[in-house]
Amino acid sequence: MRYKATFVGGGLVLLWSVAICAQAPNQPAQGAANPAYVPPSWDTYTPNIPGVVAGGTTVELITDQLNGTEGPVALPDGTLLFTQGGARQLTRIDKNGKLSTFLENIQSGGLGFDPKGRLIANDNTPGKQGIYVVYPKGAEKTLVDQKTPGFMQSNDIVVDKRGGVYFTQPEQANVGYIPPDGKGMKIVAENITRPNGITMSADEKILYVNDSRGEYLLAYDVQPDGSVTNRRNFTKYDQINTSAAGGDVGPGLRYKVTSCADGLAIDKEGRVYNAGCNGIQVYSPQGKHLGTIPTARQIQNLAFAGPDKKTLYLVGRGAAWKVETLTQGYPGRAK
């Protein structure tokens, strides 16, 4: 599989645009005489969450002109890399909000770096679904694809310190694991209504898995061989919609519970950040809800980046935001 890199060391933060019921404020109507786009004011403000964010901090809109954003991770220089599935590229965003293309011809939703500094990405291009080493040039490698027993299509990934890759398969209701040697895969967790975002604790003893159609964020104990045990409810989501409607996935009446739970991130203190229905829900390492950062749109994924990893970037529904935090993202992993 070949990918075209057009910006060495860069990458864009891109989101797909979805239809919204009402026209965005300040956006000219279709067919207007002066179609120059004026970004809407979609900033929100944080509550005071001790140790996490000061009250009244702006959740600042960077852009709402993206196409399928997902999978943000921090690059070594502090800039942010994320996926733009609708545009089939990876995008980089610098500290000033400037976007640049990092890699083309890939429809990804999850990114990570292995201990060798290689970029791992899933690709959901029809007919090419798999998980690959995609960067640097010359190091490209297939880890799993549709010829691999047990693999169908992945949503999000996290790479452990040994180079193993955990990934969610929503349609198969399971979590897979690719060992550090990159040979094959195994299913390590099953019977999750709709697994979505995934991350690990700083010491990598706990695997966290979001269930976007369940009431609880799940936790598992990680074993030396990469398998997981002791499934448990880490916390009940701060907001759950109990409408029978299927929401944004599949036909109506498919699920009775919608948590909207999508991407996950952690900070250096072990707090867990969940992209939920009502914003970014922050939980203590023990699962206590500490507060929620409100957002103007539903967020799909998030990551800490910046020179000191104290900027929390949010992507989703065709837009990207950033918020300055009091805490630092976990420095030992890209996300």
Regions found by a protein language model. Give the residues of each.
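Bacterial N-terminal signal peptides that target proteins for export
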Residues: 1-11
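Bacterial N-terminal signal peptides
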Residues: 9-19
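Generic N-terminal leader/processing signal
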Residues: 2, 21-24
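Sequence-structural signature of mature extracellular/luminal beta-sheet repeat domains
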Residues: 23-335
